[in-house]
């Protein structure tokens, strides 16, 4: 896969212009007035801890601003997600927030919503080839670049394994593009060698374990770095490492899930990417209310989804390693000190200010 194919349209975001977003025209649906806005939140899964946080944060913000919210979870089933969204539309929601399982298939959800004049916000994962009204996410390509740059900064030479996420998730492709944009010059110089590069089906830890075991076998355990795209795949990869390599092989991650941050402070996982969820969820809810009321949403970036340059609100990711745990997830209240360090002798715990 060439790393430039999806990066070129994404460079539009660097222009940092402001797009004034309004909901879909037509469809016969009246703009919601001053009454409570009814938001339908369609989620792919609650399996990972981070998605549980998304759900809680969306519900919290809806309660704070007086919006009504109904959450539907598809459990990784495209047909179920489509049916659930149809059900939400039948119930008369004013706006849909969709975290798609499959960004391609979810295009039909956008079409169905627009036929009823209901705007759609693509949440965290981009819905492809559809007239999405707004995309709310983190800077996904940048996350991949941050993972790869961290790896290169700490392991400048050696054999690398790259583990992506689900190929049905556009974010997995963008992450890999970001990683390769940083790693390719080092590959060309002969400094590093990619000995395995695979996508983990459904982001499964078991898939990451299999990929890592295979790479270890084929390379006689001679692996120096594993660029895992999220914490679930990082955990799977670490499970595959023989004891003498745990803590020696660099392993990246993403999401700052509790188990991953525990691994970071224990020296098993080298780093993760912390993506504060509340700003993401809050901006989605606030934007949903504006769209439902026909008000303008200021979106400073645009991301191409194969059909349009979608107005986008992108949050900044943060590198997390053992050196800044206290200044990030602990300080923000994302995790508790006693939970993060529970497997570390108490006399080695840092002091909490």
Which role fits each region the language model picked out?
Residues 8-9, 308:
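Residues embedded in well-ordered secondary-structure elements
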Residues 1-8:
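Bacterial N-terminal signal peptides that target proteins for export
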Residues 19-353:
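A residue-level marker of the well-folded mature domains of exported/periplasmic proteins
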Residues 9-16:
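Bacterial N-terminal signal peptides
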